[in-house]
Amino acid sequence: MEKFKKVLLIDDDDIVNSINSVIIKHAKFADEVDTINNVPNALEFLNEAKSKGNSPDVIFLDLNMPGLDGWDFMDEYEKLEIKESSKVVMLTSSISSKDEERAASSNYITAFISKPLSPELLESIYESHLA
């Protein structure tokens, strides 16, 4: 599996972010892992990263978050200029077929994956969607 330079985790649950960060680092999936727990901060982070030329290679995005959710993030993400350089993987507990269909119809969502993240799932995501 190729190592990515930078991964961004967006999930309102800080414990989930911490666990996923450890899994990604342990699997040597990325050199750097940033975690953010809400959509406004994630969008601000991406704008700053873009201006510094340091956008994440992969964004793992939770769908169900209080306030602005994953779909709200995607609405704003589609307006950003980094969308061609970052791959979005929706990592969610949603079992809604409507969410899955909406993700499949998006030009910017690379994969719709059910939580929890594991080293094996990370490898599968890479092989199926990111390689």
Region annotations inferred by a language model:
Residues 71-82:
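Short amphipathic alpha-helix used as the core "switch/output" element in two-component signaling
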